[in-house]
Amino acid sequence: MANYVYTIFLDAGHGGSDPGAVYKGRQEKDDTLALTLAVGEILESYGFRVIYSRTEDIYESPYQKAAKANASGAD
């Protein structure tokens, strides 16, 4: 039986100048990044290859993220 390794592309959403929803100083961009990194870590521990749209507080347009995802070779 073949041992398949899957590549997963995770998009944290928002970032940089786009905070997403904001409530009492809490910004959605921070929550989405933390959650994406945590999920990615779990997936990596199971042997998946994970590619992230961002790992720090930067902004990329939806078009840029889609192009990055399409070029990543993710399954």
Q: What feature does the model see in each segment?
A:
Residues 2-75:
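Catalytic-core regions of hydrolytic enzymes
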